[in-house]
Design a protein with these regions (language model features):
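N-terminal Rossmann-like dinucleotide-binding module
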Residues: 1-54
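Alpha-helical structural signal in soluble globular domains
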Residues: 20-24, 47-50, 92, 96, ...
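Beta-loop-alpha module in the N-terminal Rossmann-like domain of NAD(P)-dependent dehydrogenases
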Residues: 54, 59-117
């Protein structure tokens, strides 16, 4: 089974996470980078360009998070955004049955982290 992955956040860490996913894809068919999302379309396009070079196909680009989780068919979401957004992105994705991975810290408050754990 191949897991369809999505990345939200295309800054420096998002780029590095894409590189790591690309490396995984070179040696295994367990994952496929399916979608990339960033508020700044130019950042998402840049990461998608490199992903296409690395992987031989271009992931779908989104500038709207809700559209990505509704339309892309991802199984796993890699959240690589500003810490204050980890909670809201994670809860939305998990409520749709999407597994999540967040950069650390998981959330800005213990309450937010507990809410994420409960979903």
């Amino acid at each position: 089974m191949t897991l369809n992955l999505g990345i939200v956040g295309c800054g420096g860490m998002g780029f590095r996470h894409m590189e790591g996913i690309s490396e995984l894809m070179r040696y295994s068919d367990i994952a496929r980078l399916e979608a990339i999302c960033d508020l700044h379309e130019s950042a998402a396009k840049h990461v998608a360009d490199i992903a296409e070079k690395n992987n031989g196909y271009r992931p779908k680009i989104y500038t709207d998070f809700d559209s990505m989780i509704d339309e892309s068919g991802i199984d796993v979401l890699d959240i690589v955004t500003d810490t204050k957004t980890h909670h809201s992105f994670a809860v939305k994705a998990m409520n749709k049955g999407i597994h999540v991975l967040t950069e650390k810290p998981m959330g800005v408050t213990l309450k937010a982290c507990r809410q994420m754990k409960e979903v």
